[in-house]
Amino acid sequence: MRNRAVLFGLFFIGYSSCVFHATPTRASLVENPDVESTHVEQWDSNGKRLLQVDGPKRILAEERGMSEGILPAAEAVEKTKVSEKAVPRASLGSKLNPMTWPKRILHKLKLWYARFLHWLLRKATVDEKTIDRSMMNGLTPSNLKRVKNDILHYSSSVPHDKIEIETDYDSYVEHFFGQFKGLDKDPPVFEMDKWNNLEKEMTKAEGYLKRRALNTVSRNIDKGLSNEQLISLDVSPFVYMRLLEKRGVFKDVENNKDKIDQLKDYIKAYKEHLMVEQ
């Protein structure tokens, strides 16, 4: 019995060694593509071991398929990481950024202030008589233009009353410069009665504004400033003409031609400057 057991053990060892050396490995299949087939180990869903006859081409295809499947997945992961980094968490221009709040508040305040001024100017330019009162109080086209530009500039979008703003401005400018047509006649004509009667109808507040405008223009004219300097100070050509009328220039045209010519030159320069800045 002992001899039989030894012989059986030797037989089992020798048979196992032969089977082991006769079965080609995966590496040997790649190095020796002439091998016809091999047993490729596989497992089913239940965990049972299966044997499948396959060749080296299938093995290479499986390895290539694994590499082709892994690389795109890795690239997709990298792209996903890059895209996440590219998404801005807090933009500098975002409304939620506290750094932009002071600028936005200042922008809103300027817009409200400009609209308030426009409301006041609309009240001052309702009709021709109201425009005349505003002109006597020193309101110039440049004042109205600055308010118009402020509203258009500080609005986050085009204001719905843009056409109305432009219409108010154009009508005021046309009426304003229409008052100087009589200066080109010989002798120059100035409607003194119209403005004197309007002056009598003014309230105390309007009378104060009228006197202040005349005093301001009088100081600048008496300094002998040039047209460019007067324009920079926004001296009203209409108040300038009213000042000359108050001083009796139009009653003695022959002796005051130089003053009237200076007024006409200033009106021309003022209008050209206004049109250039449109």
Swiss-Prot record:
Subcellular location: Secreted; Host endoplasmic reticulum membrane
Keywords: Host endoplasmic reticulum, Host membrane, Membrane, Secreted, Signal, Virulence
Organism domain of life: Eukaryota
Signal peptide bounds: 1-18
Motif annotated as RxLR-dEER, chain positions: 49-64
Coiled coil: none
Predominant cellular place of this UniProt entry's protein: secreted
Assigned GO CC terms: extracellular region; host cell endoplasmic reticulum membrane; membrane
Key word Thylakoid present: no
Function: Secreted effector that completely suppresses the host cell death induced by cell death-inducing proteins.
Similarity remark: Belongs to the RxLR effector family.
Domain notes: The RxLR-dEER motif acts to carry the protein into the host cell cytoplasm through binding to cell surface phosphatidylinositol-3-phosphate.
Protein name (Swiss-Prot/TrEMBL): Secreted RxLR effector protein 151
